[in-house]
Amino acid sequence: MCGIAGTLAVDPNATPDGEAVQRMCDAMVHRGPDDHGYLTDGPCALGHRRLSIIDLRPEGAQPMTNEDGSIAVIVNGEIYNFQELRRDLQAKGHTFRSLSDSEVIVHLYEEEGVDFLDHLRGMFALALWDGPRRRLVLARDRFGKKPLFYHADSRGLVFASELGALAESGRFERRPDIDAIDAFLSLQYVPSPWTAFEGVRKLPAGCRLVCEAGRIGEPERYFQLRFDQPTTGSLTELTERLHAQVEDAVRVRMVSDVPLGAFLSGGLDSSLIVAMMAMQSSQPVKTFSVGFTSKDFSELPYAKMVSDRYGTDHHEIVVEPDMAAVIPEFVRHYGEPFADSSALPTWYLCQYTRTGVTVALSGDGADEAFAGYRRYSHSRTARALRQLPGPLPTALAKALGSIPIPAAQQVRDYGRRLMEPEHVRFLGLAAHIPHEDRVALYGPAMRQRFAEDLVARRFGELYAASTASDPVNRLLDLDIQTYLTDDILTKVDIASMAHSLEVRCPLVDQELMAFAASVPGEMKLRGLTTKLILREVAKPLLPEKILTRRKQGFGLPVDRWMRDDLAPLSRDVLLDQTARERGIFDPAAIETLLLQHQRGEPRGDQIWALMMLELWYRAFIDR
């Protein structure tokens, strides 16, 4: 795990801006506190901050080059099949100077050209410079576990692992991308390829960008998860195959030259990972859990249950979140607005885990691969209700949408969306500030600009292009391309790298995900049971209470905070003169929103998102 940055000039005779590369790397010391390295060749300059994981010797430093130094690469991430690739490349005559996983990339490129990406199993964002061809290749792993941001203009290209670092390049004016702001308010994250800065883009997951002969290329997809290659077999047979897939995904992620452990929340997913690790380790697995003084949001007893079963070297801590201290750090590290409240416990968990290990395995990705969220079952119910005869669906939608009880807001929203297209209804279930609520909050100019829901249009395009015919898998495909990459994996990357911790996600292994995509939806979601086939894998491995407990999630009591502890701060942030003068929101509408929340309507998530947006403006736009 590391931080990478670089620049490429369009003019082949230009001198690259090495100082900009150094500034960007200096802004990412937390991603790589162990070492740094730079390379300049013609119009290209590359920079790297190193967090040493594999081959801790100086020979493992980056940039890595081939035998004659003509090809160089900087990598943020891990290549899990590097030993197999190394043997194959050595058999073809390639010479290696290190034991690093990253070095295989330059030699693989010599053999395969830009198609080298097809052979990598791992998590990565990388930049490869081919000096003789004057070719720069940027690439991101299949599911976007590692981030990569870039800005292109008439002078050339500049890129970095973090938005905040890219902003230090001085190559673009810090203007907000208003379309991205609207998308953030809908989703609580900025979806790819947008970023919160105008003219800056995320390289989408599974894409590469090739620059050659003075031309800055466009992102091109080298990987697309396929849902149109269904597998056959009974639940028992597919469970056995999935068990082997999870076991292998865990095995390849336990290779490390530094201390390694695991997150253990006590939920199904992290517990399964710990069980698999324990069965493959000769030493007790180091496990880490974080709890909160609010018992409603603490899972420590469940984590202890799994720890006791497998005899792990367990570490747990109970914290009282210090919001005043943490929020500014959040805003700075994320580089753009991000309002998933589970980012806070993830932050504390990573901070605590880093005191004991340098690498941790997590259970992220299972919900998106195997249908773990309620919105999948809600969508299935809506499909069934819409198939009722005659006018019944419309009448039911009207009845549910007009329930007068204030506490029944979710039921009313469900009723109002019952007759909408599938992707619009699904977005409504996932959205934190639905389109009609955003429009009501906006000032006149914003209200006019977003009369159409651009986020719904984007979701519609992805939904229509899905290769899945199964309705459950079609929604999983949508979540994998949006929520998994731009919320879950972003949250884990930022929280972990802020504390120089590498996190590996076995359940987002590319081979496991391909198998999951081939499994019928009915083996994932059956009745009220979510993640059915994964639960079958876990049955013989975990206590019954872990298997049957209700999904709790990793969020925090935002509604209560925004009504009590953070109420004064939210008013100060959202209603002061600075916020009013931006012209984004109608101050009267913000006043009404805050009042509604104080009166008992659950608007905490919306207020939290508005706060994160305003604080981002102050940190990155107003400076």
Per-segment meaning from a language model:
Residues 93-96, 336, 595-600:
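A short glycine/serine-rich beta->alpha loop
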Residues 329-333, 354, 376-378, 561-563:
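Short low-complexity, flexible loop/linker segments enriched in glycine and/or proline
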Residues 1-4, 23, 42, 168, ...:
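Adenosyl-5′-phosphate
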Residues 38, 147-150, 272-275, 369, ...:
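Generic hydrophobic alpha-helical membrane-span motif
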Residues 1-334, 346, 350, 539-540, ...:
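Cysteine-centered catalytic environments shared across enzyme families
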